[in-house]
Amino acid sequence: MFNMNKVLELTLNHGRCLLTDKQMASDFGSLSTYKTFADLEIALEQTMNYFVEKMIPCCEAVEKGHIAILPTAFLSSVIDDCMEKGIDVTKGGAKYNLSGIQFIQVANLADSLAVIKQLVFDEQKVSAKVLEEALKNNFANQEILRQKLLNHVPKYGNDIAWVDELGVKWARKFRAKLREFTNYRGGAYHMGMYTVSAHVPMGENLGASADGRLSQTPLADGGMSAVYGRDLNGPTAVLKSVSRLDNNLTTNGGLLNMKFLPEFFQTQTGIDK
């Protein structure tokens, strides 16, 4: 899994982790030093590319380790070509030798970028320096600012095209970068969007984010789902937002969680909604 929100955190903070102050990436600047939103995006892409290039050898090491310590005989028996070749799936016996990498987490990423774009650069209603310091201090004594981030900017999952497209844009950039690599079996890397329950530990490794999320709290669940409580325009709007993430972005699978109380369907009004 690739935590794109951590990449954004580092891009906004001189390449340093908000939790440990460790230098984890190149220093392209900080939120208060980028002159335009485009400048921020250039730095974000450079940081993303750096970590993708670091990630691929790690994935290869894990997959090669599986050959030695975790062969999968039963799985291989139901995968095309493994039985015919007499080669375990971990060794490249499958007809299609893809590897999957999950892009985490599109909702928080879109929401954070939307806040920065609208409030900091377009409307200039929030000072870049003030927001930068608030993120470093987990919004201590800045609850009014946090509520502005949460409530004054539209969020992913409400069928608001420009917000959704921020997430789509970066999912496409990530997929394009993955396509530069093949795994050690000669197969392609395919992108997915699902976390199952990993959005919790992924969030634990993040400081506060520009969408108003507090430090070390969970990210949006699922993988394509909106952040809890931010999908305000109903389930159809959620589906329309998710539909902008075309299937080519989730060839390794995508997960949308939508949860309804049973009482929701007990009235005609609820059903109509």
Task: Give, region by region, the residue ranges found by the protein language model.
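Acidic, glycine-enriched catalytic cores built around paired aspartates
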Residues: 1-273
